[in-house]
Each structure stands twice: as C-alpha cells, then as structure tokens.
Amino acid sequence: MKVCDIPYQRCDVETVKKAYEKCIESIKNAKSADEVLAARKELLSVTEELNTESALSYMRWSCNTKDEFYKGEKEYYEQNAPLLSGVQIAYMQAMLSTPYRAEVEKRLPVTVYKNYEVSLKALDERIVPDLQEESAIVNEYAQFMSEFTVDFRGEKMPLTILRRYMEDGDRETRKEAFDALGKVFEENSEILDGTFDRLVKVRDRMAKKMGYKDFVELGYYRMGRLCYDREKVEKFRQNVLKDIVPVVSRIRTARAKSMGIDDMKLYDYGVCFADGDPTPILNAEQMFEKGREMYHEMSKETGEFIDMMIENDAFDVMSREGKWGGGYCTEFAKYKQPFILANFNGTSGDVDVLTHE
C-alpha cells in the first residue's frame, strides 16, 4: 500500500484510557505470567493504533503545514495524550509489582522493565496541564518556522533552500545568505525569544513540581536514557573540551589556510574547499535509483527493504513552501511501514538522507 493511501481515522484517547484500565485490572487479577503477558499484548494492539494514527496526522501535517485538518488532528493528540499519564503510571506500576514479574521479565526484552522504571520518573499527573502547554508552544514554533521565508537576491525562499547558498563555494554568497537569515531572525526576535522564554519556564515548572532541581534531570528521564546520566555527560563534555576541541581547531586552521582565508567566520565553517564542496551530479530520481542499486548490493534484505520503500512512495524529500523544515524517519506500526521526510537542497546532505535516515 502506498503511504498516501493509508487510511486515517482519529484514535479516541478515551478508548485508549479504558484499554489501559482493563489491562491494569487483568494484571492485578492474573493467575500466571501468561495472563500478565496476554493482558500486555492486548493493550499493545490498542497503543499501536494510537501511535499509528498520531504518526499519520503528524506526517501529513509536516508535509503540508497549511493543511488545517491534519493540523487539528495533530493538536488533538498533543493535547489529549498527556491525559493518559495517570493510567500509564498505574499500568507500569502494575507490571513492576506483579508477583509474576520474575518470569515475565525473562520472556521480554531486557529494556522493557528498565524503561518502565525510567518512565515513571518522567510521568506525574500534576504536570498534565504543563505538558499540554509545552505541546502548544512547540507546535506554535514549528508552525512559525514552517512558514518562515527569507528574502535573498530578490527571491523569497524557505530556510531549507537558503542553506544551499549558505554552503556555496563563493564566500561573498555565503556571507550574503547568512546576513539575509540574520536579518529575518532579528526582525522576528521578539516572537522567537518569547517562544523560547515560555518553553524554558514551563519546563522548569514541570521539573520543580516533580521535585527535580531543574529540567535537565527530568529531560534525561523523558528521553529514556538507560546507560548514562547527567554526571556522565558532564564528564564527556570535559573530554570533548580537552581532547576533541584542540584537534578541531587545528583542522579548521589548516582548512582556512588551504582556502586562503585569514579570518574564519561563521559562514566559513560549513565549507571545506575554496571552490565549494562537492554537490550531487544526479537529480533526486537518479539518486534514488543509485541508492536502490547500493542496497541491493549490500544484501537481499536491504534490497527488498528499499524496493518496498520506493514502491510505497515512503519518501517526501523535495523542499517547498509550507513544508516542515526538518527531517525525520517515523513508522506507521500498524502497517509495518516506515516513512522518511527530508528537504533536498542540492548539497551533499541530499545523499546523506539515503544513508543516514
């Protein structure tokens, strides 16, 4: 099935809540590990539906942020999903406290219970209004940036297209592109600064309500970090400063010399060669065909996978006004279908999409 043909139907959050409540009751009344796992499996089929429909609404909004229907659907999940916090907490607590936990753990991936423990540190019914406010702010910013255009050499263009000129081989072109971007940022500084300020405050408020010193600690739990924490990252930053920064400085000095630049500026950092960095000689369609050849050469499985992705039109890679300006890979779990969004701009980054995403 082509991605554009996947049907969308809003998943009612209240129905999902009832599924959680049923699962919790079943786990508490379970007479064996099998019954616990059966209850979990039934719940996962419902949450898979929620995740699929939510991902579909987000994907279709990001492809066209002017689509009012999918904008509304996306906002529905953003505002209502936090209301599930209470039952999600109760479900994980039930899984952690079941007398059959030892046997259940043996039959699930080792990260399942670790994720329960970390997730419980990130959830609290007291912060539901704050989560809703946070989603609204993030959505406001995403909508603003998707409509963001820059005047450059008499043409209005989205930031995704301007980036091509920010990496141009001509230094004056790069400077002009950076100046154009800076001018628009300055003109909209009140909006951007205000958005950032509100986001910092609501996140700090959430963390304080949950008893954390600041949002950093809560942020690690929200991201599901299992193998490292704030202290380890602080040590890593010191290692970067001590071991990596000097190397990068030497490389940049050598690069500046090879490019004939005496004083490296911000607009020079993204370029490696005086006459400009290599750019694709193929158009998007040709690059995808070469990518298909590559994946077929790697293995039978990767060949079949890229064939499925291309045949199902599971890519949206061309930049255009009104399209969300980033890139991501998501999935529609119910249909076992991944999807990739990117914004080609004629740079080597276009090739990266076919390998990284």
Regions found by a protein language model. Give the residues of each.
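Short pre-active-site segment immediately N-terminal to the catalytic Zn-binding motif
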Residues: 279-284, 339-355
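Carboxylate/His-rich catalytic cores and anion/metal-binding grooves
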Residues: 283-303
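Short, well-ordered loop/turn elements at secondary-structure boundaries
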Residues: 201, 334-337, 348
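Proline-centered turn/helix-capping motifs that create local helix->coil transitions or kinks
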Residues: 146-157, 300-307, 319
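A well-structured
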Residues: 1-278, 290
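Conserved oxyanion/phosphate-binding beta-strand-loop segments in alpha/beta enzyme cores
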Residues: 149, 153, 204, 314-324
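Catalytic zinc-binding patch centered on the HExxH motif and its immediate surroundings
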Residues: 280-281, 315-336
